[in-house]
C-alpha cells in the first residue's frame, strides 16, 4: 500500500490550454497529454501523486475531474464519453487546465440514483458497486452527476446530493462513507418532490452517546412508581448544533448508519449489522423491508452531550438498532399538519436479540429482562428458533393498575383501553414537561412518525399471577416493594395507520395537544385517543450492545500499587486515541506509534490494568472510547477460521465505533511461539493469525496517516512473557510499547489488600495490613483477592448470628490468620512449604557440619534479620553456594534444614528433570524454574546432581548441556538480580562442572561436606536417635568411634538396621512381653550391628575423591594466580 503524496504546484504557474476528446471508457478519470504531464512534473519538487484533482474551464463553465496516471495517445485530453455526457462536457471543447490544490478528503457523501431503474439495478449489485466506486470515481462535488460501470457494460447514473465537508470539491478516499438515498417508484402521486428531496438530505452524521438517568421523567401515579423514558427527545451539544445549522427543538429524523458491505476486514461485522436492522413485524412475520428503522425526535441542547455526539435513551437506541458509539444520520422531516387524524394502534413489544436468537438478558443490558419469558405453546410464526415468548400479562398488569386513574367519565371504554389511554397521556406529558424544563419553551404538539416508541419503568407493583393462574416466572418482580432497585420495564410501539404516509419514509404527524389544565397535569388528546386501538404484540429484532461492562472494571485511581506504570499506559493510549495526535502524525509524515503489550505472570494484574485504562478513556468526555474485550483464552480450542472470524468482526466493530480500545486478553493462548509446535498444524494456524494481526495493524497505520474516515484505534494485548509471542508481532510499529508487571512488593501488596477490603465496604487497621503484606511474600493480586475473601468468610463465622445494629464490619488479625491457614498461592502450588520437607525441623535436625551451618546462617539469616543495613550495601551479596563432597555426607539434607530453619520456601530440582530432547525446551525449563523462584521469593532454589546438567562445555555431542550451561550463566549473573532467591547446588564431582559457573557472582562460594569426624558422628547419631526407642543405658560414643569412615547416610542406615534387628529379636523371644510394648534397641545390639556394618564408600574410593577435590582446589588456585600475572612477549 502506498501513501498518498501531495504535489506542490506554485501559484504562478500559467494555465495550459488543451482540447477535450471523448473516447470509449469505463471510469471517470481523464487522460492527460504527455506535454502537459511534463510541464506539471517540471513545476513539482516531487513525483506526481497517483491521483491528481484537475479543473477544466471554458468560459464561465467549470468541470472538476481526476487524473489517475494515464496519458492520452494524442495531444488532447481524453475522457470517457458517458462521463462527459453526465457532466455536460461536449466533445472538442477547448479548455484551460489547472491543478486543484488542497482538495479535502470526504468523510460522508450522499448520492442518489437518477432513475428508479438505476436504484433497482444497484440493489441487485450492491457489493459490486461498492467495490467499483473507488476505482472509477475519486472527485465529486454537490449537484455533480457521474456514471458507475458494472461488469464493464451496465451503467448506473448518480447525482451527488450532499458532501461533508460541504464546500467545494472533495475526493473519495478509503474510509469515506457513501450513503445512497433510495429512488423508489412513486406510489403516492400526492407526494411533493421538493419535500422528499429535503427529507433525504443528510444534515449531520453523529456518534451515539449514552444518557444518564435524567433521560427518564417521574410520572405522578398513585400506588406505585412510574418513570417514562424520553423517547421523543435527543440531546445535542450547542456547538455541534451550530456547526450543522441545527436549532433547539428542531424536528429531525434519526436512523442508524448501515454501510454497504465493503472491505474484507469489515465484511462479517457489517453483514451482521445488516441482518440486525431487519424488522420482525406484527405476529412475528418478517417485514419485507430491510431498511433501518427511523425515529422522529426533537433536538434539545445539553452540555452533557459530547461534541459530535447525539444522546438518546438506551431503549430508543435498541429500537433503532443503533448501538452505543455507533453512528446515526440526522435528516429533515415532513409534517402533515392539515390531514385528518388517522387511526392509531398501540402494540406491546419486546426486543429479540439477533446475535444469539434470545431476548435481551438483564445481565448484559438493562432492557428485556426476565419479563421476556412466558410458558406458551404458541410461539410466533417466523421465529422457529425462539421458544419462549413474552409474558404479555406483565403489560396487562400495568395497564389494569393504571385504568383506575384514567378517564373519569362514564363511557364505553373497557379497563384495558382506559389504561392504554392513560399510559399515552403520561408519555405525552413526560415528553412535553422535559422539553419545557430544559428549553423554557412550552411545546403544544408532539410529532409522531409511522412508528413511535414508548418505554416505561415501574416499581412497587404488588405480586401478580400469570394468565393461566400459575406463579409468574418473573420471580424478581413478584414483589416490587421488596426490591426497589429492580424496575419492571414495559415497551409499546404506537403505529400510524395512514396509507398516505407509506410512500414518505421521513414523514411525521402533528398531534396538537391542549394543556389548559396544566396544574392538574392533564393533557387533552381525546381526538387522538378515540381512534386508538390495541394492536397485536410486536417482536423487534435489535442489536445487542457489546460494550465493556463498566460495573466490573476498576477505576484508575484504585490501582495505586502499579505506580508509574498506569500513567505510562495512559500516556501512550492518549497518543493513540487523540485526534489531534493523528493530525500531527499525518501532517509531518510520522509513522503511527505502536500499541500496548502488557506482560507478566498469571494474577499480576494485566487484565485489571487493561480494563481500568480502557474505562478511563470510555468515560472521558472528549473521546468516549468504545471498549471491546476479547478473552482469547476462550478461543484457544477453536479452529483458526473461527478465531479469524471473531478477530475480523471485532476489528470491524472497532473501526465502525471509533475511537475504540480493543483488548486482546491472553493473546498468547491463540498466538504462541513455542518450539514444540514448530511444523505442526497449530504452528501453521499461529502463522496465519500472526500475519493477519500484523497486516491489520500495518494497514491501519497507513490508512490512519494517509486518509480520513478511519477513526483512532488502540490495541492492548496481555501475555505472560514476551518470548511467548512471535517477534514480528512485538516489533516496532505494532505491539512495541511493552509494560512489565512484576510480582508486587510489600508496599504494593498492602495497597492491593486495602483496595480489596474497601471494595467490599469493610474496614481493617493499617498495622494489620502492613504485617499481613510482609507475610504474603510471593502472593500476586489474584492470591490477595482470594485471601481477602477467605478472611471475610472467617469474619462472617465470627459475627454469626449477624448483628443488625452494626453498620460496618471490621476484619481483625484472627480472620487473616484463619484465612492463611492451608492457603497456598497459585505460583507455589508445587513448591515445598517453608515448614520442613520429610520431617526436617531446622538446624537442630542437622548433626555436625558446624562450619557449613555457620556459613549458611551468615548468608541467609543476617540479610533477613537486618534488611535495612544490607539494603544500603552497594555491593551484590553472595547468595549462591556449591556444596560438594562424597555421597551421603548431608549435602541435600542441610539445604532442606536451612529452608526450614529460616522459614524459606524450598524448590528442589533433580538435575535430569530439566533435560528435554526438543531444541530449546531445556533452556526454557531453566528459565521457568528461575522465574518460579523469583515469584516465590524469599526461597531456596536447590539443584541436586548438578554435574548431570552443567558439565564442561564442548564435551556434549548433542549440544543440549552446552545450551543449558549458557542459560544458567545468564540467570545467575544477569542484569536483573535475583532478589530473595538463594541458589544452592550439590555435586560429588565438582571437577566435572563448567568452570564458568564457579566464577565470582555465580556459584562462587564452595563448601565441602566431608566425612564426619568422631565428635560429628556422635552428634549425627544423637540427632537420628531422637525418634527411636532405645535403652536408657545405651552409649553412642563408642559407636561413633567404631564407625570410622561412615557418612551421615551410613549412620542412618546403621540405626535402621539396629531397629529392624530389635524387631526380629522381639519376635524370636520365647517369653513374649505384654501386648502394647514395642521393641527397644539395646546397647549390645547396637554395637553388634555396628561391628558388622561397613561404610558405603571404600578407602580406595575415598582416596580417589580426595585426590579429585585436591586437584579441583589446586586448579582454582592456579587460575586465580594466573589472573594476577602480566603477560609479556619477553
Curated annotation (Swiss-Prot):
User: Does the keyword section mention Nucleotide-binding?
Assistant: yes
Organism superkingdom: Eukaryota
Concerning InterPro entries, the annotation shows: AAA+_ATPase (IPR003593), AAA_ATPase_domain (IPR050168), AAA_lid_3 (IPR041569), Asp_de-COase-like_dom_sf (IPR009010), ATPase_AAA_core (IPR003959), ATPase_AAA_CS (IPR003960), CDC48_domain_2-like_sf (IPR029067), P-loop_NTPase (IPR027417)
Keyword Cell membrane in record: no
Q: What is its EC number?
A: 3.6.4.-
Under which main EC class is this enzyme filed? hydrolase
Q: Which reaction does it catalyse?
A: ATP + H2O = ADP + phosphate + H(+)
Its primary localisation, in coarse terms, equals cytoplasm
Tissues showing expression: Mainly expressed in meristems and young developing leaves. Expressed in seedlings, roots, leaves, flowers, siliques and stems. Not detected in root tips.
GO terms, biological process:
fatty acid beta-oxidation; protein import into peroxisome matrix
Gene Ontology CC: one annotated term: peroxisomal membrane
Q: Name one GO molecular function term.
A: ATP binding
Induction (record text): By wounding and avirulent pathogen infection. Systemic induction by hydrogen peroxide.
Question: What keywords were assigned to this record?
Answer: ATP-binding, Cytoplasm, Hydrolase, Membrane, Nucleotide-binding, Peroxisome, Peroxisome biogenesis, Protein transport, Repeat, Transport
Where does this protein hold ATP? Answer: 600-607, 885-892
Instruction: Give the subcellular location.
Output: Cytoplasm, Cytosol; Peroxisome membrane
Q: What does this protein do?
A: Component of the PEX1-PEX6 AAA ATPase complex, a protein dislocase complex that mediates the ATP-dependent extraction of the PEX5 receptor from peroxisomal membranes, an essential step for PEX5 recycling. Specifically recognizes PEX5 monoubiquitinated at 'Cys-11', and pulls it out of the peroxisome lumen through the PEX2-PEX10-PEX12 retrotranslocation channel. Extraction by the PEX1-PEX6 AAA ATPase complex is accompanied by unfolding of the TPR repeats and release of bound cargo from PEX5.
Q: How does it assemble?
A: Interacts with PEX6; forming the PEX1-PEX6 AAA ATPase complex, which is composed of a heterohexamer formed by a trimer of PEX1-PEX6 dimers.
Q: What family is this protein classified in?
A: Belongs to the AAA ATPase family.
Descriptive protein name: Peroxisomal ATPase PEX1
Please report the organism this UniProt entry assigns to the protein: Arabidopsis thaliana
Which lineage ranks, top first, belong to the organism behind this chain? Eukaryota, Viridiplantae, Streptophyta, Embryophyta, Tracheophyta
Amino acid at each position: 500500500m502506498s501513501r498518498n503524496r501531495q504535489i506542490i504546484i506554485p501559484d504562478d504557474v500559467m494555465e495550459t490550454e488543451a482540447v477535450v476528446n471523448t473516447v470509449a471508457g469505463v471510469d471517470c478519470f481523464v487522460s492527460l497529454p504527455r506535454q502537459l504531464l511534463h510541464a506539471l512534473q517540471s513545476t513539482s519538487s516531487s513525483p506526481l501523486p497517483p491521483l491528481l484533482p484537475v479543473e477544466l474551464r471554458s468560459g464561465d463553465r467549470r468541470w472538476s475531474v481526476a487524473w489517475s496516471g494515464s496519458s492520452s495517445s494524442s495531444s488532447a485530453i481524453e475522457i470517457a464519453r458517458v462521463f462527459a455526457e453526465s457532466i455536460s462536457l461536449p466533445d472538442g471543447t477547448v479548455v484551460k487546465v489547472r491543478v486543484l490544490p488542497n482538495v479535502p478528503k470526504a468523510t460522508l457523501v450522499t448520492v442518489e440514483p437518477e432513475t428508479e431503474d438505476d436504484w433497482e439495478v444497484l440493489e441487485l449489485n450492491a457489493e459490486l458497486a461498492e467495490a467499483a466506486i473507488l476505482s472509477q470515481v475519486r472527485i465529486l462535488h454537490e449537484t455533480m452527476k457521474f456514471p458507475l460501470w458494472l461488469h464493464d457494460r451496465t451503467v448506473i447514473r448518480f447525482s451527488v446530493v450532499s458532501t461533508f465537508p460541504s464546500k467545494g470539491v472533495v475526493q473519495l478516499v478509503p474510509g469515506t462513507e457513501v450513503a445512497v438515498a433510495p429512488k423508489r417508484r412513486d406510489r403516492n402521486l400526492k407526494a411533493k418532490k421538493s419535500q422528499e428531496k429535503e427529507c433525504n438530505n443528510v444534515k449531520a452524521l453523529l456518534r451515539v452517546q449514552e444518557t444518564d438517568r435524567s433521560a427518564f421523567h417521574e410520572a405522578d401515579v398513585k400506588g406505585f412508581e412510574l418513570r417514562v423514558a424520553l423517547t421523543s427527545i435527543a440531546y445535542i451539544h450547542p456547538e455541534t448544533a451550530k456547526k450543522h445549522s441545527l436549532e433547539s427543538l428542531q424536528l429531525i429524523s434519526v436512523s442508524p448508519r448501515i454501510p454497504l458491505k465493503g472491505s474484507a476486514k469489515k465484511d462479517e461485522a457489517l453483514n451482521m449489522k445488516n441482518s440486525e436492522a431487519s424488522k420482525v413485524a406484527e405476529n412475528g412475520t418478517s417485514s419485507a423491508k430491510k431498511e433501518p428503522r427511523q425515529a422522529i425526535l426533537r433536538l434539545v441542547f445539553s452540555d452533557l452531550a459530547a461534541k459530535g455526539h447525539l444522546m438518546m435513551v438506551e431503549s430508543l437506541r435498541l429500537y433503532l438498532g443503533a448501538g452505543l458509539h455507533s453512528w446515526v444520520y440526522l435528516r429533515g422531516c415532513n409534517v402533515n399538519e392539515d390531514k385528518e387524524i388517522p387511526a392509531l394502534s398501540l402494540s406491546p413489544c419486546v426486543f429479540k436479540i439477533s446475535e444469539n436468537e434470545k431476548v435481551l438478558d438483564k445481565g448484559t443490558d438493562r432492557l428485556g429482562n426476565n419479563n421476556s419469558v412466558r410458558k406458551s405453546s404458541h410461539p410466533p410464526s417466523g421465529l422457529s428458533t425462539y421458544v419462549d415468548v413474552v409474558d404479555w400479562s406483565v403489560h396487562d398488569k400495568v395497564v389494569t393498575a393504571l385504568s383506575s386513574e384514567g378517564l373519569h367519565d362514564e363511557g364505553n371504554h373497557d379497563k384495558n383501553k382506559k389504561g392504554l389511554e392513560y399510559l399515552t397521556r403520561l408519555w405525552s406529558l413526560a415528553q412535553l414537561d422535559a422539553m419545557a424544563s430544559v428549553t423554557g419553551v412550552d411545546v403544544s404538539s408532539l410529532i409522531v412518525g409511522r412508528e413511535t416508541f414508548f418505554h416505561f419503568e415501574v416499581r412497587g407493583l404488588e405480586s401478580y399471577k400469570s394468565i393461566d393462574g400459575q406463579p409468574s416466572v418473573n420471580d424478581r418482580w413478584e414483589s416490587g416493594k421488596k426490591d426497589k432497585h429492580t424496575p419492571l420495564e414495559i415497551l409499546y410501539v404506537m403505529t400510524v395507520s395512514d396509507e398516505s404516509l407509506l410512500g414518505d419514509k421521513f414523514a411525521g404527524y402533528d398531534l396538537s395537544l391542549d394543556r389548559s389544565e396544566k396544574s392538574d397535569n392533564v393533557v387533552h388528546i381525546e381526538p387522538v385517543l378515540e381512534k386508538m386501538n390495541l394492536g397485536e404484540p410486536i417482536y423487534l429484532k435489535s442489536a445487542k450492545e457489546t460494550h465493556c461492562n463498566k460495573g466490573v472494571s476498576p477505576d484508575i485511581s484504585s490501582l495505586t500499587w502499579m505506580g508509574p506504570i498506569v500513567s505510562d499506559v495512559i500516556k501512550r493510549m492518549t497518543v493513540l486515541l487523540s485526534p489531534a495526535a493523528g493530525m500531527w502524525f499525518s501532517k509531518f509524515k510520522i509513522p503511527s506509534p505502536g500499541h500496548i503489550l502488557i506482560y507478566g505472570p498469571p494474577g499480576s494484574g494485566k487484565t485489571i490494568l487493561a480494563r481500568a485504562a480502557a474505562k478511563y478513556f470510555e468515560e472521558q468526555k472528549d473521546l468516549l472510547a468504545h471498549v471491546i474485550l476479547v478473552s482469547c483464552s476462550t478461543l484457544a480450542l477453536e479452529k483458526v477460521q473461527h478465531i479469524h472470524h471473531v478477530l475480523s468482526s471485532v476489528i470491524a466493530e472497532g473501526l465502525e465505533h471509533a475511537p475504540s480500545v480493543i483488548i486482546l486478553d491472553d493473546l498468547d493462548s491463540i498466538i504462541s511461539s513455542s518450539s514444540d509446535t514448530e511444523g505442526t498444524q497449530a504452528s501453521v494456524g499461529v502463522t496465519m493469525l500472526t500475519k493477519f494481526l500484523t497486516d491489520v495493524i500495518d494497514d491501519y497505520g497507513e490508512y490512519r496517516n494517509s486518509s480520513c474516515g478511519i477513526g483512532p484505534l488502540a490495541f492492548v494485548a496481555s501475555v505472560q512473557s514476551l518470548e511467548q509471542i512471535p517477534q514480528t508481532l512485538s516489533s516496532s510499529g505494532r505491539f512495541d510499547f511493552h509494560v512489565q508487571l512484576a510480582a508486587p512488593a510489600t508496599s504494593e501488596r498492602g495497597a492491593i489488600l486495602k483496595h480489596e477490603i474497601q471494595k467490599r465496604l469493610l474496614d481493617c487497621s493499617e498495622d494489620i495490613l502492613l504485617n499481613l503484606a510482609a507475610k504474603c511474600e510471593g502472593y500476586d493480586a489474584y492470591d490477595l483477592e482470594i485471601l481477602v475473601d477467605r478472611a471475610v468468610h472467617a469474619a462472617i463465622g465470627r459475627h454469626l448470628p449477624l448483628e443488625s445494629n452494626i453498620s460496618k464490619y471490621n476484619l481483625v488479625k484472627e480472620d487473616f490468620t484463619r484465612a492463611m491457614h492451608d492457603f497456598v498461592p497459585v505460583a507455589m502450588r508445587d513448591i515445598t512449604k517453608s515448614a520442613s520437607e520429610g520431617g526436617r525441623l531446622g538446624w537442630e535436625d542437622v548433626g555436625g557440619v558446624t562450619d557449613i551451618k555457620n556459613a549458611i546462617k551468615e548468608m541467609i539469616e543476617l540479610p533477613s534479620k537486618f534488611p535495612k543495613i544490607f539494603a544500603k550495601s552497594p555491593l551484590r551479596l553472595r547468595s549462591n553456594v556449591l556444596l560438594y563432597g562424597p555421597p551421603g555426607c548431608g549435602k541435600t539434607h542441610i539445604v532442606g534444614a536451612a529452608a526450614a530453619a529460616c522459614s524459606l520456601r524450598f524448590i528442589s530440582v533433580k538435575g535430569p528433570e530439566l533435560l528435554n530432547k526438543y531444541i530449546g525446551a531445556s533452556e526454557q525449563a531453566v528459565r521457568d524454574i528461575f522465574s518460579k523462584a523469583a515469584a516465590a521469593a524469599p526461597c531456596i532454589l536447590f539443584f541436586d546432581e548438578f554435574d548431570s546438567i552443567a558439565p564442561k562445555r564442548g564435551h556434549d555431542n548433542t549440544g543440549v548441556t552446552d545450551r543449558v550451561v549458557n542459560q544458567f550463566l545468564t540467570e545467575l549473573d544477569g542484569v536483573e538480580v535475583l532478589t530473595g532467591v538463594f541458589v544452592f547446588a550439590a555435586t560429588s564431582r565438582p571437577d566435572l562442572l563448567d568452570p564458568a559457573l564457579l566464577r565470582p557472582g555465580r556459584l562462587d562460594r564452595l563448601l565441602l561436606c566431608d566425612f564426619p569426624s568422631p565428635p560429628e558422628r556422635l552428634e549425627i547419631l544423637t540427632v537420628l536417635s531422637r525418634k527411636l526407642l532405645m535403652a536408657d543405658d545405651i552409649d553412642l560414643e563408642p559407636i561413633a568411634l567404631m564407625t570410622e569412615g561412615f557418612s551421615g547416610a551410613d549412620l542412618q542406615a546403621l540405626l535402621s538396621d539396629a531397629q529392624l534387628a530389635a524387631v526380629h529379636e522381639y519376635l524370636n523371644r520365647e517369653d513374649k512381653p505384654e501386648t502394647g510394648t514395642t521393641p527397644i534397641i539395646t546397647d549390645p545390639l547396637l554395637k553388634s550391628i555396628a561391628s558388622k556394618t561397613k561404610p558405603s564408600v571404600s578407602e580406595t574410593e575415598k582416596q580417589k575423591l580426595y585426590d579429585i577435590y585436591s586437584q579441583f582446589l589446586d586448579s582454582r588456585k592456579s587460575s586465580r594466580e594466573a589472573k594476577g600475572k602480566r603477560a609479556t612477549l619477553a
